[in-house]
């Protein structure tokens, strides 16, 4: 009887270890996806700042041109 219980316990431990290993793999995959998402986010933020700067420069140039037209 006790041998049967030990076998059951061993099987449950093996299943628990397998589950833990699978969860660790999933965690590693999610960490990698998170890192990739963070890099993409950083790149998009940088691009957004660059585009805002370009937009502001264009607005200033347009204002300057409109000012010159008004002076004519």
Curated annotation (Swiss-Prot):
> Where is the sequence biased in composition, kind Basic and acidic residues?
44-57
Which Gene3D superfamilies does the entry link to? 1.20.5.340
For the region Disordered, give the residue spans: 33-57
The parts of the chain that form a coiled coil are 1-72
Specify whether Cytoplasm is a keyword of the entry: yes
Pfam families on file? ZapB (PF06005)
Name where it's found: Cytoplasm
Q: Which UniProt keywords apply?
A: Cell cycle, Cell division, Coiled coil, Cytoplasm, Septation
Source organism's superkingdom? Bacteria
The biological process GO terms on file are: division septum assembly; FtsZ-dependent cytokinesis
Record's GO cellular component terms: cytoplasm
| Subunit structure comment from the entry | Homodimer. The ends of the coiled-coil dimer bind to each other, forming polymers. Interacts with FtsZ.
- Protein family per UniProt: Belongs to the ZapB family.
Q: What job does the chain carry out?
A: Non-essential, abundant cell division factor that is required for proper Z-ring formation. It is recruited early to the divisome by direct interaction with FtsZ, stimulating Z-ring assembly and thereby promoting cell division earlier in the cell cycle. Its recruitment to the Z-ring requires functional FtsA or ZipA.
Name of the molecule in the record: Cell division protein ZapB
